[in-house]
């Protein structure tokens, strides 16, 4: 991955999204040397116009098949651990818990979303991979479920009454032929972007020489036949255990990149929703 290094000052996205870094900088005069912003390359999307309900389904694990287990991460020496942020770095408090409580109170009784069948049971069983890293997300009309599978990361699409509409489908079957994302690794992420009424999916893909964050953004709220945009973002290290969220001006994802530490990526949400070339992703080092 070709990366350009920029100083944190003047990087408006960094200041908008990562207050922790900004606070550390303002109090200490300048950030640590590895707190610069790295900029990748623009990514041109590939349009995916297929009906997922008519695609071949992924083979599911059955008793007797091998089970692949992820190796536990170790630090060397074995009694060493990654240090916390230095004590003299002042960081912003975590207000999420308080805000969640205020949100729960403000909703009031009877404001829950209703559906004909409020409970949907997804009995997935063993997938041949440990851990499975299951994820689930809902929209007004659909439920998407993703999990690690022996043949690659898979997802299923249900309606709100629990009827399976499509899948299991492997993420890699949506990637263009020959692209590194045609090799599925693990760690599915699925979000419903409620601000745009679209789906956002991501998995860790690629090969040892071509690491990727493989991103799929739906063209409509219909994940079955509404179409998708594919974006393959190169990363300089294995982007293990990604987690993402939706911000009003970016899709923001974190990764654990081994000796490189925890990283934060900001992706061009506006262009990705429109199927346009995504401006270069920005990569930050976490506190």
Language model: regions and residue ranges:
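C-terminal PAP-associated
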Residues: 25-287
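Bacterial N-terminal signal peptides
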Residues: 10-21
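Basic/polar N-terminal segments that are highly enriched at the extreme N-terminus
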Residues: 1-2, 23-27
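Bacterial N-terminal signal peptides that target proteins for export
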Residues: 2-10
């Amino acid at each position: 991955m070709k990366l350009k290094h920029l100083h944190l000052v003047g990087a408006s996205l960094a200041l908008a999204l990562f207050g922790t870094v900004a606070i550390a900088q303002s109090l200490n005069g300048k950030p640590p040397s590895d707190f610069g912003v790295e900029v990748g390359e623009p990514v041109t999307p590939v349009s995916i116009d297929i009906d997922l309900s008519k695609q071949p389904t992924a083979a599911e694990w059955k008793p007797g098949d091998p089970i692949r287990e992820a190796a536990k991460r170790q630090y060397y020496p074995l009694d060493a651990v990654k240090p916390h942020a230095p004590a003299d770095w002042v960081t912003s408090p975590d207000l999420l818990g308080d805000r969640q409580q205020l949100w729960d109170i403000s909703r009031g009784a009877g404001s829950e979303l209703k559906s004909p069948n409020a409970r949907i049971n997804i009995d997935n069983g063993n997938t041949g991979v440990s851990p499975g890293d299951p994820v689930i997300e809902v929209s007004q009309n659909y439920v998407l479920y993703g999990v690690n599978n022996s043949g690659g990361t898979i997802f299923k699409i249900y309606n709100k009454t629990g009827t399976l509409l499509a899948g299991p489908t492997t993420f890699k079957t949506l990637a263009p032929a020959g692209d590194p994302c045609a090799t599925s690794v693990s760690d599915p992420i699925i979000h419903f972007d409620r601000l745009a009424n679209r789906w956002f999916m991501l998995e860790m893909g690629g090969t040892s020489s071509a690491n990727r964050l493989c991103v799929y953004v739906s063209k409509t709220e219909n994940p079955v036949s509404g179409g998708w945009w594919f974006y393959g973002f190169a990363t300089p290290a294995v982007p293990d255990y990604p987690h993402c969220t939706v911000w009003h001006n970016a899709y923001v994802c974190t990764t654990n990149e081994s000796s490189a530490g925890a990283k934060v990526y900001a992706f061009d949400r506006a262009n990705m929703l429109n199927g346009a070339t995504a401006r270069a992703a920005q990569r930050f080092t976490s506190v």
